């Protein structure tokens, strides 16, 4: 699932905020999945998404000059980028590495752990030091299969799935910074932004809200949280 990442680009910057918001919209996401024939056993974040690029970028204008990888089959996201003035290139994940090598794409939003594991950083040598969004994943099972499972076993499966998901999430959160440091040792350039440049990105995201078919931008964080 990429729902949280699509809805909340740049809006929240702490894991506590993401946990709060996910709790608020989880029921909608789960029911939406069931309408599409799948049962969600657990839902966790995979990590913060950053921009990894072949060329150095600092502003949305810089990104508009790049060729952005988007998920193959995710036509809504590709259309969103296109309408915002960017150059999306839909590709299947297995084609990302070869497409980076040939220059078909040269910009991609991914969590650092994923970039490190696939060694994309050998080509995309620049990371924009800005949390772009959160990548969310879910463990699912076909709803018809789920409905054939006895309730007592369903309960056990849900419990085990939640425990495994939480452990996976905690490990990812701990190892994220380590992945960036490892890539820096191999030549990754982490590019910081000025306040003015950060504001440009925030303005861009706000301008894209009307283009998003389903939005939860009315939700707010509790006053004790920091943004």
Regions of interest found by a model, annotated:
Residues 16-30:
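A gly/proline- and charged-residue-enriched helix-loop-helix capping module
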Residues 21-23, 100, 222:
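A generic signature of intrinsically disordered, low-complexity regions enriched in glycine/proline
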Residues 1-16, 31-219:
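N-terminal secretory/targeting leader peptides
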Residues 220-227:
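A short, hydrophobic C-terminal helix/tail in secreted or cell-surface proteins
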């Amino acid at each position: 699932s990429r729902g949280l990442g699509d809805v909340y680009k740049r809006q929240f910057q702490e894991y506590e905020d993401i946990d709060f918001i996910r709790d608020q919209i989880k029921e909608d996401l789960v029911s939406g999945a069931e309408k599409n024939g799948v049962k969600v056993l657990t839902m966790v974040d995979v990590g913060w998404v950053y921009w990894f690029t072949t060329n150095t970028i600092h502003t949305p204008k810089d990104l508009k000059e790049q060729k952005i990888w988007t998920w193959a089959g995710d036509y809504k996201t590709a259309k969103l980028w296109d309408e915002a003035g960017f150059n999306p290139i839909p590709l299947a994940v297995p084609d990302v590495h070869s497409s980076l090598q040939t220059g078909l794409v040269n910009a991609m939003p991914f969590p650092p752990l994923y970039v490190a594991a696939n060694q994309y950083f050998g080509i995309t040598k620049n990371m924009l030091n800005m949390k772009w969004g959160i990548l969310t994943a879910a463990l699912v099972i076909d709803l018809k299969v789920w409905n054939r499972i006895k309730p007592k076993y369903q309960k056990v499966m849900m419990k085990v799935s939640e425990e495994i998901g939480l452990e996976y999430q905690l490990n990812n959160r701990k190892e994220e910074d380590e992945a960036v440091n490892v890539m820096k040792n191999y030549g990754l350039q982490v590019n910081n932004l000025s306040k003015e440049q950060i504001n440009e990105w925030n303005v861009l995201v706000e301008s894209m809200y009307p283009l998003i078919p389903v939005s939860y931008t009315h939700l707010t964080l509790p006053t004790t949280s920091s943004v």
